[in-house]
Amino acid sequence: MSASNRPRIVRHVESGTTCCDPQWEAAYQRFETPEEEVRKFIHRLTRFGFPNLPKDSRIAEIFCGRGNGLVALERMGFTHLEGVDLSDDLLHQYRGTATLHLADCMDLPLTDGAYDVVVVQGGLHHLPTLPQDLDRCLECVMRILKPQGTFFVVEPWSTPFLTMVHLIVEQPWMRKIYAKGDALA
């Protein structure tokens, strides 16, 4: 791959710093292909009215993973995009024009009051300590949003599938087999 095809990643933490273990990242990548995820995100964003937003809206996606939400936004015509994730490996899979930040979403390195929209598509449930980490993350989101900005959140906490997964991984015998049950989610 040439240097021009590599994503632009601004590092705010050391490259070795990660939040996700390799088994979870592997499970995430097997769950659906990048193109399937992009199509899912386009459908979701369309359903929630993103086509009606100005195409020059400044949008940040936090917990962006491999950047497929950003690709969806690009395909929908948005041009001022930034993504934040703590996984260097996932960020390197992104193929688009957005600026990426290798950073902790509880300490967002983005400009105060600069974003029209902040998007989270399935990342908040990975915060290690609730509710403290959620509070810190939401404070950061409020700090970077413009006064009339929008925070768009999709979290899978109450889906039937995840309800079953959480019931299974909370079983003591499952914890003995695999202590990091989040990789199954």
Spell out what each predicted region is.
Residues M1-P54, D56-G65, F152-Y178:
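Conserved class I S-adenosyl-L-methionine
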Residues R66-D107:
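Class I SAM-dependent methyltransferase SAM/SAH-binding core
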Residues M106-V118:
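A short acidic, Gly/Pro-enriched loop at the edge of an enzyme's catalytic core
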Residues D135-P147:
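A short glycine-rich, Lys/Arg-flanked "PGG" loop and its adjoining helix->strand segment in the class I
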